Amino acid sequence: MRNSKYLILSSFYFDFNDDLTEITNVKKSFKKQTILDLYRYNDFKIIKKRVFSIDYNLNFIYLPKNIEIIDNFAFYKNQIQILNLSNCINLKIINEDVFFKNQIKHLKLPENIEIIGYNAFSVNQIKILDLSNYIKLKYIEDISFSYNQIKQLKLPQNIEIIKRYAFEKNEIKILDLSNYIKLKQIEIYAFLYNPLTEIKILDDITIEYNNDKDDIWNTFAKYYNDNNKKAGDYKLENNKWKWYPL
């Protein structure tokens, strides 16, 4: 399939720097392509800022194992549906807005990933998000997975902070945070506008909230704080949160 359907790189589509580590120019002849295949180019290290954003309609991308940097907005506003970066062993950072406004349904990241940047995967179509194997990932940045369709969520085992709006506007009903012993802070609006009915959580976590808002997430955060940040199984019953032991 790769030989018959995937784009074969050539000077017809791109200009390269001298050592073939990055694309310096994308030619007009590439505009109608829907597949970007860099898989075999092991010297390729950098995808520059905005290089494939807005004016392209990429459905699939295949990156080389030695890629190190995908810069801000690199694939903004494409139509990528399946994104598998698990072979990219040197990629430790997904920069800001890189895959913002695509159609990603299935996502796999490199095991060594350390940072998922601001707004990196927002406005996609992810339904199941499993980050449990990414042990170096300690922070979920602002807005990084907002406006998806996430129903099932597993966080990294070493997660410490979930930042503002990180999972805003998804489809999470049951949120189980009871296994994350290093989780210390959930910033304001992290799970805003999810249809939450049950939250399992450990004690003494700093959860920020807006006292003037009465949505499901803010009312939970206020109740958790008023309940002395007690570990428990919190359930929404008749539009009110109630505490049960784990």
Annotate each predicted stretch with a short phrase:
Residues 1-7:
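PEST-like, low-complexity acidic/proline-rich intrinsically disordered segments
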Residues 7-21, 30-46, 56-69, 79-93, ...:
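Structural signature of tandem-repeat unit edges
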Residues 48-51, 71-74, 95-98, 117-120, ...:
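Consensus positions within tandem repeat domains that build extended binding/scaffold surfaces
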